[in-house]
Amino acid sequence: MPSVVQSNFRVRKNLGRVRRIIDVPNLIDIQKSSYDKFLQMSVPPNEREEVGLQAVFRSVFPIKDFNGTSELVFVSYNLEPPKYDVDECRQRGMTYSAPIKVTNQLMIYDTRDGGERIVRDIKEQEVYFGELPLMTETGTFIINGTERVVVSQLHRSPGVFFDHDKGKTHSSGKLLYSARVIPYRGSWLDFEFDPKDIIYVRIDRRRKMHATVLLRALGYSTQDLLNYFYSTETVYLEKGGKYAKSIEYDLLAGQRTTRDIKIGNDVIVKKNTKFTRAAIRKMKEAKLERLSLEPEELVGKVAAHDIVDPETGEVVVEVNEELTEAKLERLRDANIEQFRILFIDGLNVGSYLRDTLLTDKVKTMEDSILEIYRRLRPGDPPTLETAKTLFHNLFFNAERYDLSKVGRLKLNYKFYRDVPEDERPGLDLTVLTPQDILETVRHLIELKNGRGSVDDIDHLGNRRVRAVGELMENQYRIGLVRMERAIKERMSMSQEIDTLMPHDLINAKPVSAVVKEYFGSSQLSQFMDQTNPLSEVTHKRRLSALGPGGLTRERAGFEVRDVHATHYGRICPIETPEGPNIGLIASLSTFARVNEFGFVETPYRKVENGRVTEDVIWLSALEEEGKYIAQATVNLDEGGRFKESLVSARYNGEFKIVTPEMVELMDVAPNQMVSVAAALVPFLEHDDANRALMGANMQRQAVPLVQSHAPLVGTGMEERLARDSGVCVIARRPGVVESVDATRIVVRAEGEGAEVPDIYHLMKFQRSNQSTCYTQKPVVRTGEVVKKGDVLADGPSTDMGELALGQNVLVAFMPWQGYNFEDSILVSERIAKDDVFTSIHIEEFECVARDTKLGKEEITRDIPNVGEEALKDLDDSGIVRIGAEVRPGDILVGKITPKGETQLSPEEKLLRAIFGEKAGDVRDSSLKVPPGVGGIVINARVFSRKGTEKDDRARDIEDQERARIERTRDEEIKILRDSFFRRIRELLLGKEATGKLVDDKGKVLFQKGAIIDEPSLAEIPRKYWGEIPVDDAERVQQILRDLEELVRTREEHFRDKIDRLSKGDELPPGVIKMVKVYIAIKRKLQVGDKMAGRHGNKGVISRILPEEDMPYLQDGRPVDLVLNPLGVPSRMNVGQILEIHLGWGAFELGNQLQRMIEQQRASAEIKEHLKAIYAGDETMNGFFDNLDDGDVKRFVKTVDEGVFMGSPVFDGAHESDIKGALDLAGLPTSGQAILFDGRTGDAFDQNVTVGIMYMLKLHHLVDDKIHARSIGPYSLVTQQPLGGKAQFGGQRLGEMEVWAMEAYGAAYALQEFLTVKSDDVMGRTRMYEAIVKGDYTLEAGLPESFNVLIKELQSLCLNVELVETSAGVEASAAEEEE
């Protein structure tokens, strides 16, 4: 029976109090789902949605020629299987991509006399459209052999935005409001107020014009516009020549009355007072309909329409004209009984649009369209037809203007929220409508009138994510549009369109070129950070505000970078780079996902009538507005009701204290607001934000170590991250482990399709992008039962399927001889000796033999002027052997390059004369190990151009690879056969033979009626099993047919692989042969290496002390690391102290359990102790009761390093938990102990904080940084040595160093620094010659940089000449002048 205690699963005590409601969504889903949606690879062509590639093809096709006689129509596309698999692409430096084939129809039309078109001919053909990179299982792309990630972009969402200039434009500080309609692609439309309150419009940020020009161009008259933007009041002429106006109750609030308003004798509103709500209510009750007016009240009002004399038909007052006393007199004379005026009171309603109409000189629709044309195409003589076309194309043509669904959604949200659903514009309407433009102006005027508020562009409802799929879609569209132009020209130019096929018209080069360029060099397509699994996952979850169409570092202000209230649960407030990109590059939060519109959503639990339900809904930042949201850590009772009478809740970004009934939603988890990297930091809630940021970022730089150990104090997120990162091997189906070795695991599957076993090949010592070592090792044993999703093998930096970036080490916080000054770290020699922090790094070196002008370079062992000692590790082909230990300067690949005839020096001539013509025409250009690198050669690969003969080494490598592939093939087929025959055996056993079975030689193997049992079946050769006559013979036959089919496809697959091996490689032009050599470098921990904890506590190793000199505990155990206690208070990362206490307790509890096993205590006693340790963790209740004695021992063995704790972020262990763990382990609850000095044996004065801390070794290794220059390159202009290790540069002597030399009065040393050691070219040569002669005097000349300065001055037209005179002559000349 299989054990309850799994070898591939770690039990972690959960110290959190909040129950898990939903699982964290797949961490790299943002990449995978986006690209899947783009390709729709698994969807049949006729069922594809109009998104991604399908949408691009649909939007560009059909392509019509200029005459309308033919068109090219898109039918469907399909992606073929990729030529090389992922591993082959990595090794060969290829792109992992699939050929895309598009089915097109070329339709040719005939035009009849009446203008009617009829189809004359349709030609359909599948056309090759280039290659499209595919995404790997882990969400990356392989481009030219390297893994790259396309980072998602966070950009401003299309839609309409309202803003003001914050009073900066005008000196008075007046707020000038503006509106901007941003489409996904197309022209931008801006409306803005000027300081005189006139509304202007700009199209594509050109010169501004009156907004009414655009509105008139839409076909609206002055009257239409006034009636749209203003309410009207009707004025009546009453008997006696008095005026009255109709009461519009909606407009009364806030107005003043000019006379007492009475109902009967009661005065409701006194003269010169405002209408109150109560007064309006009384007026409504009394059903007052008119208010009498004084004539002077009408003076200055504006007519809402042309007021016409009914008798003469003459217009007395034009629309938008002010009423004057004279006009009123004329109206009275003409006896016009009623007319409408605009309601403009200057308080609630301003006269902005009316004023704009007055100042606008353009009055008709046609003139307006021509005016717009003139502004956009200055210099072009406009005709009405071209102007109309241009205007229509600007905003109303779907080919030129696209709001996208998101833009339409945002417009509907802004303008039509109160309109019934069926009356709103549909999401498929992605062009502007005249109504949208009117609404934009109306909203702008409302803002100016003091109603509503401007938009916050940093609100996540106004920013959206463009993931890989969408970015690729845009690139593909650019390529297709380029191709479309060429196709149109070809279709129109070609006379024989009848004889052409679609492939004659289509040249897909521009499309593939765009795609290739995007993946190779776009700002968002990045070289994957592959230091460890966490850095990979974080890179894929990154959101960047930079990139094409985004912000730039220099222009981005503080607001864009800042944390916004809507980031909660969507974007991590902690994880962002330090430096110029701070805030511009962010990370998705743990539970966040991106919806179909590109807005980031976060999950919430629904709360109904003060009771929290299990329903989870995902909301975007816009949908969350106006909701009261409780925290995940609020106390609930059994029924899900709030225990407290008042609850803290978020409301529109503010925290409020509300009653439980008001709460509508609740967070799903405490770690909902932080990203994955921040969620891995235990006790994050006790760390200062700046240090938490460093802690989250530095985990990404941790190097995978030779021995991985998961943290004793984790957060429970480790297992999820390791699983989703793709570095572990995960079981695809349930089954039983059949065989395990270091390179592959075979699982006999159960359930559907169980005949085919699952074979998992493990990755072995692969070089990552950052030269760290990626390797996998099995964690399951033969015979073990595995479930779907179980971990079968650990990858780099994982331990039992959990992320393990560092090591648990015993740390003491105390000063030690000044060796922990400025965050330095004192380390015990045991750490170096036991390889605790040892890592393996794999460097790749490349040697290329080219065809040069002087002849071909050759890779060979025969190198001129090199002794046999230097060639001892090279084989006959001149390539280093695998397993050789190499040091700096050793030859890895011998190569000779032909050189031109050069003038020989006398020495060379002499040597030639003595030794004859020894390799005079070639020089040694071998690949040597660079300085600072040394290790063991673990692999060498030879790539030869197709058609060239391979050398011995290449043939050896090919033979080995072929043998490996054949071995794998044979093993796979054997496993397949065994599995199928096992199935047949199960079918046959116990059955009765219905006939006799005879072999080829006539021997009877089975008699009729015999019962088939195990021994008799074992004696029959397998090839006869299918012929055994039984009732189920047909099923057996079917199984055998399936087996043969499977075997055939597998053999074909491997045959293809072998064929590709022998073909030769595709190399860049001019390259004959390329050799790659891989060297594994073992890096032990040493002085100068950088280490860090998870709380931003970083430091450099200052000294490695012998174990016996380290401070030790009372039981004699020396500590591993000594850290500076002064690094904690000022940095406020107290989380590390809590971690160290809990870690110590966890470690000692593990030791206690081991001692109990050693003392052979009863398993019941051990179980009780385990229950006490895991008390409070609901998941572990009842687990220990089911364990037998063997299981107990096995379980205790899994905690030999300590009891693993999980302290989730923001829901972590409390002080009582930590004290409880220390107490249970028999340790002082203060977390401090007496330490003894290892050198003297004396106790230190005070108790010291000691415990287990999880420390990481970071990628900043001293071996990669240490560097010394001997003879190196000089800068071309200044003639000074270059800087930096990569350039083999020198150490810069800056002005501060010069001051120091001056302060010491070391004049000659300083002169030497500034001249011969730097850029005095002549002086350098003289110095060399002098030293050779044994003369050690310094003769400095003129530094080259002085000449540069003179040249710069001359470039400024200042002539500077150096005049050489002797000092004496100069002095006397000066005296004479005096």
From Swiss-Prot:
CDD domains: RNA_pol_B_RPB2. GO terms for cellular component: DNA-directed RNA polymerase complex. PROSITE patterns: RNA_POL_BETA. The keyword Transferase applies. It catalyses: RNA(n) + a ribonucleoside 5'-triphosphate = RNA(n+1) + diphosphate. It comes from the Bacteria. InterPro entries: DNA-dir_RNA_pol_bsu_ext_1_sf (IPR042107), DNA-dir_RNA_pol_bsu_external_1 (IPR019462), DNA-dir_RNA_pol_su2 (IPR015712), DNA-dir_RNAP_su2_dom (IPR007120), DNA-dir_RNAP_su2_hyb_sf (IPR037033), RNA_pol_bsu_bac (IPR010243), RNA_pol_bsu_CS (IPR007121), RNA_pol_bsu_protrusion (IPR007644). The keyword Magnesium does not apply. Its EC number is 2.7.7.6. PANTHER family: DNA-DIRECTED RNA POLYMERASE I SUBUNIT 2 (PTHR20856). DNA-dependent RNA polymerase catalyzes the transcription of DNA into RNA using the four ribonucleoside triphosphates as substrates. The RNAP catalytic core consists of 2 alpha, 1 beta, 1 beta' and 1 omega subunit. When a sigma factor is associated with the core the holoenzyme is formed, which can initiate transcription. NCBIfam families: PRK00405.1, rpoB. Belongs to the RNA polymerase beta chain family. This is DNA-directed RNA polymerase subunit beta. It comes from Sorangium cellulosum (strain So ce56).
